[in-house]
C-alpha cells in the first residue's frame, strides 16, 4: 500500500463531526462490518458505573462470555470519563463526554488488515497528509513495525517503539492480552523526524488506537497465542474533528463550540477576548452540558451515590463556573436546550427525552442554588468568629460539602482582609483525590477477574429474600479494592459473598437490592447486588470498622427500595397484560428494566402505540390496581406452567422447575423477581413515554407509586412555567402557542417577501455594473442581508435583464453579524451554458472556498459556506475564472 494521501479534493473530505462519524461507519460497513448502535451510558456490566470506552459493550464477547454479534462490527459509542475531571477545560483534549469510533474483529481479520484499513481511513477518507502522521508500536512487536514499514510504507523514523505501559493491553493479571499500535497526528512536521517524543502534547495528539488481542497470559505470566485473535480499536471523534477542522483544541470544534458560545452569550462575554480562566470556565460548561444531557437521557438522576453522584457533580460544576463568569441566574435549562439542539441529529433520544432532561436540570439547579445559599451562610458564620485566616479544612468543607467554589471563598475573604490557607486546602483536596482514585470508575476487567476467581470457589448462595428482608449470615469471600482479600477496612470498596442472603441479585430486568451489612464493629453500605453462577455478589463500601472472611453479620435490605422495586415489577407484568389486551395478543417481551424509581418495557411491535391506546392501557392498569388483586406465587414444572398459560420470554432458558407469578384473571408469567402481595400496594401507574429503540421494537417507560407524584409535580411545574411565560391559564396554553406559531409563520412569510422585494430592488442598481466580455455580460457582486430565496430572485432578475449571455454570480451573508453562514447563487443565460459553463458545477466549486458546497441546475444554482471571511476572495476567484472562460469563447 502506498503511503500517500488520496487525490480527492479537500472539499470532498469530511469536515463536520457528523461527516467524520458517518465516514468512519460507512468505511467499515463497506468492508463487511455490522454497524452497531451506541450502547447506553449505563452499562450492563455491574462492575462498571458508566460506559467509558467503545469496547465496553463488547467486553463479554472478548472474554468469551457471550456470542459475537457478527464476525466484524463497528460503532460510534457514547462514553463518559470523570477520572481527570480537574483537567477538563485546562488541556486541549480532556473531556467527560466523548464519542469513540471503533472497528472490531471477533476472531476474523487481524493485525495487517487492521493496520492497512486504519491508514487508508486516515489518509484517503480523512485526507491527512502522511507527513503529519507518526505511529507507535509495542517494543517487542516486530510484526506490527514490519507491516507499517514494508506494507504501508511509513518512514521507519516515524515508527516509534514504546514500553508495555504505553503499548500493551491486558484484561487483567491473567487472560486475553496483546500489543497495541497508535496513530498520532504531528502538528509540527517541519521539526523533522529526529528525536521524536510522543509525550510532547503541543506537537502530537494520539487519535487512533489499535489493540491486537493475540495472547493469553497465565498465572505465571507466560504468554501463549490465542486460538481466536481479536481486534479492538478506538478513534476519538472530538480529536479527529480538531485535526480536520484545524482548530487549536477539541473545544473549538463544531461538536462543542456551539455550547461554549451559548454560555458566552448568557454571560455576555466574548470567548476569544477572555483570559485563560474565563475560557476554561466556558469550556467546562460546554463539555459538562453535553455530558449531563446524555446521562439524564440514559436514565441517570442526580443523587449522592454512584452514577447519580457523578451527574450531580457535573451539574454543580456547570453552575459554579457559570457564577465565575457572572451568571447568577438559573441557566442549566438553557444549556440543556442548546445541548439537545446540538446532539439531536446524531442522538435522537435526547429530543425524545427532552422533557425529562430539562426537568432534571431545573430541579437539580434549584437544589444547588439553595445549597450555595447555605454555604454562604456558613462562610458568614466563619467570618463572624474573626479568624486570622480561613483554614484549609474550612475552605474544603465549603467546597466539598456545599459546592462552594474556592475562588468565591477567596474573593469574600479578601473583601474582609483575610487569606485562605491554600496549602491546607490542597492537602484536603489531595486526600479527596486519593479516595476518589480508589473508587475511580474504570473499565475494571481486573475487578471482574478477581470476582470471577472468588465466585469460582464458592457454592450457590442461599437466597431468602422472598421470605424475609433481614437475617443473620456469614461472610464467605471478599474482594477489596479490586483484589481477592481476607479482610477490608473502612473506606474500602468491596464485593462480598455471603452464605445466605435476603438481598435480591440483579436479574430478570430487576435491579439488585440496596441495604446494609452490620456486625459487632462494622457497617457496610450495599449499593448493588449481582449474580454469577447462582453466587450473589454484594457490592458496596465499608463505612465503619473492619470486615473479615468468616465474620458473622446481619444482612438488612433497604425496605423502602425493595417496596418500590417490587411495585414496579408487578406493574411491569400488568403493563404486558394490558398491551396484549389493547394492542395485540401476540406481543412479545424484548427486554425490561425494573428500577426503584421507574420501569421500562421493550416489546416487539411493527408500529408505535397510539396516544388513544396508551390512555386505554393506563386506565386498564389503574383499574386492576384499584381492584386489589391478590398475587399467587408458586413453583411448578415448566410444562405445567406453560399448560396453565404462563407467559415466558422468548429465547430465555428456564429450569425444569419454574416460579410462576399469577395475578388471577389478569396476568400469569414465569418470573424470579420480587412482587407486591396485592396490586393495591402499587398505588398508581403513569406512562411517561413511548418510543422506538430498534427496528420492530418499541419501548414504554412508566412510573408507579410515589414516583407518580414526583412526575406529576414536574409536569405541573412545566405547565406553570409555560403559563407564566405566555401569560395564560393552563387551559389556554395550547391555544396561545398555536396562535404564536401562526403569527410567527405569517411574520416569516412577510419577511421572506420583503427580503425578496429588497433583493430585486437592489438588483436593478447592480445591473449597471455588468462587464461586457465579447457577447457575454459578466456580473459578480456581493449582496449582504438577503436570504437564499431573495438572492436567487435577484440573480434571476439580473440574468433576465442582461439577456442570454448573462453570467451572474451573487454572494452574501444573510446576517452580516454572523460570519458563519454564506450564501452563493449563480444564474447563467443559455449562451453561457452553450459555452460549457454550468451554474450548478461552477457555484459548487466556488462554495468550497468558503468551507461549504452546493449545486443545482445549469441555469440556476445555490450553494452555502461557513467562512464569511473567505467570501470576498471566493467572489474574486469567480470573477477571474468566468472572465478567463468567457474570453476564450468570445
From Swiss-Prot:
Gene3D superfamilies documented for this protein: 2.40.30.130, 3.10.310.40, 3.30.54.20, Bira Bifunctional Protein, Domain 2, Threonyl-trna Synthetase, Chain A, domain 2
The EC number(s) this enzyme carries: 6.1.1.7
Cofactor: Zn(2+)
UniProtKB keywords: Aminoacyl-tRNA synthetase, ATP-binding, Cytoplasm, Ligase, Metal-binding, Nucleotide-binding, Protein biosynthesis, RNA-binding, tRNA-binding, Zinc
Primary location class: cytoplasm
The name this protein goes by in its record: Alanine--tRNA ligase
Function: Catalyzes the attachment of alanine to tRNA(Ala) in a two-step reaction: alanine is first activated by ATP to form Ala-AMP and then transferred to the acceptor end of tRNA(Ala). Also edits incorrectly charged Ser-tRNA(Ala) and Gly-tRNA(Ala) via its editing domain.
Natural source organism: Synechococcus sp. (strain CC9902)
Cofactor note: Binds 1 zinc ion per subunit.
GO process terms (BP): alanyl-tRNA aminoacylation
Family affiliation: Belongs to the class-II aminoacyl-tRNA synthetase family.
Keyword Nucleotide-binding: yes
NCBIfam families: alaS
Reactions catalysed: tRNA(Ala) + L-alanine + ATP = L-alanyl-tRNA(Ala) + AMP + diphosphate
Pfam families: DHHA1, tRNA-synt_2c, tRNA_SAD
Record's comment describing the protein's domains: Consists of three domains; the N-terminal catalytic domain, the editing domain and the C-terminal C-Ala domain. The editing domain removes incorrectly charged amino acids, while the C-Ala domain, along with tRNA(Ala), serves as a bridge to cooperatively bring together the editing and aminoacylation centers thus stimulating deacylation of misacylated tRNAs.
Molecular-function GO term, any one: ATP binding
Subcellular localization, as worded in the UniProt entry: Cytoplasm
The keyword DNA repair is assigned to this record: no
GO cellular component, one term: cytosol
Binding, Zn(2+): 569, 573, 671, 675
Amino acid at each position: 500500500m502506498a503511503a500517500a494521501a488520496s487525490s480527492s479534493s479537500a472539499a470532498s473530505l469530511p469536515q463536520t463531526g457528523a461527516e467524520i462519524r458517518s465516514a468512519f461507519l460507512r468505511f467499515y460497513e463497506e468492508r463487511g462490518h455490522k454497524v452497531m448502535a451506541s450502547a447506553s451510558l449505563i452499562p450492563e456490566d455491574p462492575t462498571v458505573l458508566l460506559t467509558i470506552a467503545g469496547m465496553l459493550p463488547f467486553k463479554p464477547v472478548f472474554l468469551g462470555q457471550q456470542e459475537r454479534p457478527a464476525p466484524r462490527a463497528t460503532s460510534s459509542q457514547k462514553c463518559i470519563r470523570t477520572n481527570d475531571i480537574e483537567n477538563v477545560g485546562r488541556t486541549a483534549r480532556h473531556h467527560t463526554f466523548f464519542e469513540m469510533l471503533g472497528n472490531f474483529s471477533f476472531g476474523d481479520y487481524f493485525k495487517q488488515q487492521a493496520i492497512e484499513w486504519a491508514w487508508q481511513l486516515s489518509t484517503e477518507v480523512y485526507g491527512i497528509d502522511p507527513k503529519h502522521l507518526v505511529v507507535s508500536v509495542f517494543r517487542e512487536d516486530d510484526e506490527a513495525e514490519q507491516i507499517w514499514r514494508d506494507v504501508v510504507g511509513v518512514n521507519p523514523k516515524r515508527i516509534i517503539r514504546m514500553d508495555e505501559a504505553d503499548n500493551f493491553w491486558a484484561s487483567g493479571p491473567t487472560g486475553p492480552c496483546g500489543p497495541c499500535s497508535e496513530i498520532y497526528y504531528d502538528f509540527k512536521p517541519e521539526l523533522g523526524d529526529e528525536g521524536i517524543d510522543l509525550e510532547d502534547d503541543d506537537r502530537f495528539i494520539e487519535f487512533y488506537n489499535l489493540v491486537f488481542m493475540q495472547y493469553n497470559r497465565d498465572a505465571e505470566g507466560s504468554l501463549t497465542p490465542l486460538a481466536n485473535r481479536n481486534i479492538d480499536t478506538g478513534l476519538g471523534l472530538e480529536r479527529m474533528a480538531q485535526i480536520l477542522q484545524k482548530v487549536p483544541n477539541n473545544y473549538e470544534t463544531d461538536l462543542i463550540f456551539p455550547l461554549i458560545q451559548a454560555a458566552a452569550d448568557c454571560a455576555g462575554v466574548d470567548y476569544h477576548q477572555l483570559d485563560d480562566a474565563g475560557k476554561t470556565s466556558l469550556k467546562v460548561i460546554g463539555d459538562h452540558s453535553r455530558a449531563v444531557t446524555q446521562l439524564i437521557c440514559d436514565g441517570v438522576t442526580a443523587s449522592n451515590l454512584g452514577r447519580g453522584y457523578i451527574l450531580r457533580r457535573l451539574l454543580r460544576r456547570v453552575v459554579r463556573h457559570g457564577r465565575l463568569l457572572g451568571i447568577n441566574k438559573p441557566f442549566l435549562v438553557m444549556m440543556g436546550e442548546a445541548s439537545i439542539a446540538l446532539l439531536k441529529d446524531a442522538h435522537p433520544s435526547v429530543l425524545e427525552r427532552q422533557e425529562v432532561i430539562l426537568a432534571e436540570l431545573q430541579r437539580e439547579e434549584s437544589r444547588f442554588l439553595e445549597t450555595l445559599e447555605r454555604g454562604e451562610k456558613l462562610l458568614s458564620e466563619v467570618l463572624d468568629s474573626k479568624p486570622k485566616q480561613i483554614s484549609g479544612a474550612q475552605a474544603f468543607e465549603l467546597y466539598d460539602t456545599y459546592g462552594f467554589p474556592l475562588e468565591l471563598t477567596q474573593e469574600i475573604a479578601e473583601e474582609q482582609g483575610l487569606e485562605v490557607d491554600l496549602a491546607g486546602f490542597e492537602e484536603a483536596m489531595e486526600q479527596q483525590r486519593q479516595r476518589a482514585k480508589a473508587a475511580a470508575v474504570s473499565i475494571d476487567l481486573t475487578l471482574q477477574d478477581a470476582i470471577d476467581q472468588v465466585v469460582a470457589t464458592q457454592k450457590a448462595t442461599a437466597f431468602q429474600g422472598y421470605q424475609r428482608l433481614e437475617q443473620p449470615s456469614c461472610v464467605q469471600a471478599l474482594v477489596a479494592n479490586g483484589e481477592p482479600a481476607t479482610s477490608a477496612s473502612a473506606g474500602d470498596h468491596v464485593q462480598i459473598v455471603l452464605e445466605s442472603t435476603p438481598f435480591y441479585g440483579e436479574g430478570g430486568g430487576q435491579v439488585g437490592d440496596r441495604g446494609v451489612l452490620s456486625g459487632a464493629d462494622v457497617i457496610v453500605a450495599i449499593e448493588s447486588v449481582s449474580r454469577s453462577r447462582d453466587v450473589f455478589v454484594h457490592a458496596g463500601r465499608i463505612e465503619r470498622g473492619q470486615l473479615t472472611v468468616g465474620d458473622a453479620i446481619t444482612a438488612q435490605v433497604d425496605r423502602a427500595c425493595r417496596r418500590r422495586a417490587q411495585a414496579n415489577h408487578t406493574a411491569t407484568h400488568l403493563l404486558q397484560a394490558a398491551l396484549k389486551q389493547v394492542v395485540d395478543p401476540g406481543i412479545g417481551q424484548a427486554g425490561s428494566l425494573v428500577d426503584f424509581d421507574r420501569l421500562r418495557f421493550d416489546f416487539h411491535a411493527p408500529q408505535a402505540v397510539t396516544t388513544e391506546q396508551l390512555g386505554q392501557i393506563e386506565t386498564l392498569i389503574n383499574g386492576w390496581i384499584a381492584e386489589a388483586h391478590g398475587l399467587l406465587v408458586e413453583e411448578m414444572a415448566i410444562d405445567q406452567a406453560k399448560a396453565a398459560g404462563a407467559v415466558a420470554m422468548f429465547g430465555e432458558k428456564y429450569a425444569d422447575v419454574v416460579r410462576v407469578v399469577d395475578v388471577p384473571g389478569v396476568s400469569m408469567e414465569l418470573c424470579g423477581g420480587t412482587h407486591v402481595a396485592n396490586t393495591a400496594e402499587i398505588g398508581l401507574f403513569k406512562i411517561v413515554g413511548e418510543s422506538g429503540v430498534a427496528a420492530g421494537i418499541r419501548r414504554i417507560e412508566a412510573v408507579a407509586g410515589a414516583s407518580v407524584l414526583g412526575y406529576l409535580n414536574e409536569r405541573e411545574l412545566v405547565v406553570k412555567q409555560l403559563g407564566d411565560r405566555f401569560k395564560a391559564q393552563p387551559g389556554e396554553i395550547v391555544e396561545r402557542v398555536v396562535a404564536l406559531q401562526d403569527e410567527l409563520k405569517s411574520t416569516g412569510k412577510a419577511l421572506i417577501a420583503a427580503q425578496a422585494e429588497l433583493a430585486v430592488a437592489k438588483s436593478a442598481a447592480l445591473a449597471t455594473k455588468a462587464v461586457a466580455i465579447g457577447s457575454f455580460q459578466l456580473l459578480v457582486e456581493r449582496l449582504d442581508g438577503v436570504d437564499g430565496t431573495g438572492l436567487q430572485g435577484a440573480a434571476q432578475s439580473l440574468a433576465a435583464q442582461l439577456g442570454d449571455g448573462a453570467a451572474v454570480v451573487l454572494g452574501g451573508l444573510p446576517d452580516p453579524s454572523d460570519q458563519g453562514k454564506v450564501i452563493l447563487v449563480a444564474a447563467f443565460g443559455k449562451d453561457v451554458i452553450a459555452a460549457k459553463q454550468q451554474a450548478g458545477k461552477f457555484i459548487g466549486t466556488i462554495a468550497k472556498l468558503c468551507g461549504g458546497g452546493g449545486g443545482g441546475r445549469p441555469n440556476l444554482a445555490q450553494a452555502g459556506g461557513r467562512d464569511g471571511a473567505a467570501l470576498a476572495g471566493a467572489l474574486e476567484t469567480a470573477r477571474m475564472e468566468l472572465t478567463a472562460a468567457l474570453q476564450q469563447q468570445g
